[in-house]
Amino acid sequence: MIKQRTLKNVIRATGVGLHTGDIVYLTLRPAAVDTGIVFRRVDLDPPVEIKAREENVGDTTLSSTLVKEGVRIATVEHLLSAFAGLGIDNAYVDLNASEVPIMDGSAGPFVFLIQSAGIVQQEAPKRFILIKKTLLMEEEGKWARFEPFDGFKVSFVIDFDHPAFKGRPQGVEIDFSSTSFVKEVSRARTFGFMKDIERLREANLALGGSLNNAVVVDDYRVINEDGLRYEDEFARHKILDAIGDLYLLGHTLIGAFSGYKSGHALNNKLLCALMADKSAWEIVTFEDDETAAPILFTRPLTAA
């Protein structure tokens, strides 16, 4: 049986909110079977819990933001991407602020945190969402699509007419039945343009952004001293974002996702359209044969 997973231990980290610039204290906690990923604003009295589900996304400006009765938790996608990549089904995420810390702009620090906490299996079958038919969402020359596929495959194409992107791959496809999220995707950082950052700061956004947590591009080139971590880091980060957004379905996906210039808003519209079309998906488990699962996960340490 392929089992659900949670964390073995509580683990804490401190970081900065990308948009607020505030210091954020983050605590990841184990959770019981079928809890899902639940974010908690523990700075509020009483604390407010928001489940990481597509219907709770209330804002997609620059990030995926969970909203409940006016309470916001922004920039959840990189942490969710790490949970997805490591196959974590159940966890609590405690925050003392309205934003998940940006860390280094990738999912790498979250992967390290989760692996440091330890991963344990739980005595319940892991549930997957199986895509049964093609679903397409288009908007202003951009699109996002689900297709049936025996595994989990993500492809993404960006299209920037800019010197820093010339000669670099602007499209990438990764099949996670044969390759590792940790190795191929987790270290790809968010990126931004210098001209946009100045405009965002005037609007009190990107206040925590720096060369330590983003790839920054001026009019001609990448200005980070160490350059890029992958030749196609820009496109790979969009895959990282998409995996985080897709995990708002609440389960690991069996299917293919393709995006062309898509972002958090279009991704969320596709998720909502999928959930609304009951003929397009079904929940499946692998209770008899563990080798039948078509997705490669890092092996957990032990059973809970």
Curated annotation (Swiss-Prot):
Cofactor(s) listed in the protein's UniProt record: Zn(2+)
Residues that span the membrane, as ranges: none
GO-annotated biological processes: lipid A biosynthetic process
InterPro entries: Ribosomal_Su5_D2-typ_SF (IPR020568), UDP-acyl_GlcNac_deAcase (IPR004463), UDP-acyl_GlcNac_deAcase_C (IPR011334), UDP-acyl_N-AcGlcN_deAcase_N (IPR015870)
GO molecular function: metal ion binding; UDP-3-O-acyl-N-acetylglucosamine deacetylase activity
Cross-referenced SUPFAM superfamilies: Ribosomal protein S5 domain 2-like
Disulfide pairings: none
Gene Ontology, cellular component aspect: membrane
Active site as annotated: 264
EC number(s) recorded for this UniProt protein: 3.5.1.108
Family: Belongs to the LpxC family.
Protein name from the UniProt record: UDP-3-O-acyl-N-acetylglucosamine deacetylase
Gene from which the chain derives: lpxC
